[in-house]
Design a protein with these regions (language model features):
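Primarily interfacial, aromatic-capped hydrophobic alpha-helices that serve as membrane anchors
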Residues: 173-182
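Flexible, P/S/T/G-rich "lid" or insertion loops adjacent to the active sites of thioester-utilizing
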Residues: 182-196
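Non-catalytic N-terminal regions of enzymes
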Residues: 1-174
Length: 196
């Protein structure tokens, strides 16, 4: 089983989230027809296999742990799909509210829940991803992958290992002391202007 360290954003979101205020990213799509539950489950499984971070779970830690780690499971621990039938807009809204009010656990993979709402005017697929695991763009990519898998369309992924490019400091951090000083000057100027 592979592991990858938490980056700075993972750490921040883990420590900000509270049980009474779950931090999740919620996206949904409505289709004009019917979504087949069996095909959707297959699409969810295929998406988990395609995206390593979709199979990530929080690695247990102990007193000697220096950094939090994600464990990348070979497969999901569960398939988090709830299926409901709604006859009114209020029932659709209730399904949505149920989904977004849940604190999606990161100790099991995947760290997201999906709800399929069957409705006479068209079905809904709702997705809620723990914000510690994914931001809005990552959640959009995950939903896009689920939809492509469902439709049997190609779902290309980059030809690099996504677990090796999660270090935000290496990607966007200052590369030298002068650059760091310049960034601090800009930050101080921004804070000074914002305070006025």
């Amino acid at each position: 089983m592979r592991t990858t360290p938490f980056n700075h954003l993972d750490d921040a979101f883990l420590n900000i989230e509270r049980q009474e205020d779950p931090w999740s990213v919620h996206l949904e799509v409505q289709v004009s027809g019917h979504i087949d539950e069996s095909r959707l489950r297959d699409a969810l499984r295929a998406t988990l296999q395609k995206h390593p971070m979709a199979r990530a779970r929080f690695q247990p830690y102990h007193e000697a742990t220096v950094t939090y780690q994600w464990e990348i499971a070979d497969a999901g621990d569960h398939l988090a799909l709830d299926v409901v039938t709604a006859t009114t807009e209020a029932e659709i809204a209730a399904a949505r509210e149920r989904l977004i009010s849940i604190k999606v656990p990161i100790t099991v993979a995947p760290a997201f829940y999906a709800t399929l709402v069957h409705h006479a005017d068209g079905d809904w697929l709702m997705l809620s991803v723990n914000h510690t695991l994914a931001d809005g763009l990552s959640t959009f990519r995950l939903l896009t992958s689920i939809l492509r898998q469902y439709a049997g369309q190609p779902d290309p992924v980059p030809d690099f290992d996504p677990l090796t490019v999660r270090d935000l400091k290496a990607l966007a951090g200052a590369k030298s002391v002068p650059e760091r000083i310049e960034r601090i000057k800009h930050l101080m100027s921004y804070l000074r202007d914002a305070a006025m």
